[in-house]
Amino acid sequence: KLVKLIGEAKELGVDMFLLDDGWFANKYPRHSDTQGLGDWDETADKLPNGIGRLTEEAKKQGVKFGLWIELEMVNPKSELYENHKDWVITLPNRNEYYFRNQLVLDLSNPKVQDYVFDVVDNLMTKYPDIAYFKWDCNSPITNIYSNYEGKNQEKLYVDYVRGLYKVLDRIKAKYPDLPMMLCSGGGGRTDYEGLKYFTEMWPSDNTDPIERLFIQYGYSQVFPAKVQCAHVTTWNKKAPIKFRTNVAMMGKLGFDLNLHDLSADDLAFCKQSIKEYNRLKPVILDGDQYRLVSPYEGNHTATMFVDKQDRNAVVFAFDVHPRYNEKLDNIKLQGLNPKATYSVREINRADCASDNNPKTYSGQYLMTVGLPLFTNNDLSSRIYELNQQ
């Protein structure tokens, strides 16, 4: 089944297949979130040929292979917990409190730091074609007490973070080119220090495209698009696939979908979107971002990306829930060369057709008069590409 999914990922046009939670543990197989966390060996019944069979298939298909891990956590129903209960943050003489059926490992303890590093190191040594890790963290620190810290319990929070950074420093030193996503029950770990170790971050588990317009707008005030993971999912199916995909194209685009649930037209649109995204990625991920219209200020929102030479730009425009016959003004663009001339055309259209009649404007006109980016259509969106002539 997984081999088939890797083939479908290749057909879709994405460059990486990520195997998420559920691939590990044998004594207590990870059939649910109640067990197995901490035992990072492949479940033999699920993966009789190991991760290597999947990395080989991904390589054959020309797709990178990524893997989900949550190394800071442990389920009480696991071999790790049975063998090293003293490695777990738990209050003595108190009932344990579980968040998502799990507890937190004590990363202030050097032995735990070694264990966490060794999991990554062993996976990379055994399966060097692993190209990406999704590093998850789905629980706050509960039952706050360290068996390692002894009388210095007041240092635990700080020493925990320092211990985590020591692990990440070791991973970075040995695998400097290994991309990793930082995820924590959504965006709970989104911070600047994380950028030293992680190539991207997961802003929120809420992937409703309407909510994501607000989330990504706020996120962009602090972090650039190139570290913002944005995926197309099944949340809010009232929003057309075009709307959902266009929202996700404003960050690091991904798809969390069963392709068999898509119509032929929607599948064709997703394939087209990936091609357009790959072509425009340098502008979106490495260009300057301009927030033209805030989603907090009305029924529409628009964001613009301009490359460093002011030659190429991409404008995303969204109509969320416009009012009937709402008055729509032109939106002034930003970041262009006022003396240059730009061609403007709509791309990534729902009919998958090309706009063969681009219009031409001066940068001065686009920034002082603007363009009619919005419509009165509910949950509609458009992407415009600008190229200097």
Region locations from a protein language model:
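Conserved, mostly hydrophobic/aromatic
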Residues: F17, A58, V116, M180, ...
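Active-site proximal loops enriched in glycine and acidic residues that flank catalytic Cys/His/Asp
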Residues: D21, L67-L71, C137, L182-G186, ...
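C-terminal beta-sandwich/jelly-roll accessory domains of carbohydrate-active enzymes
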Residues: H321-Q389
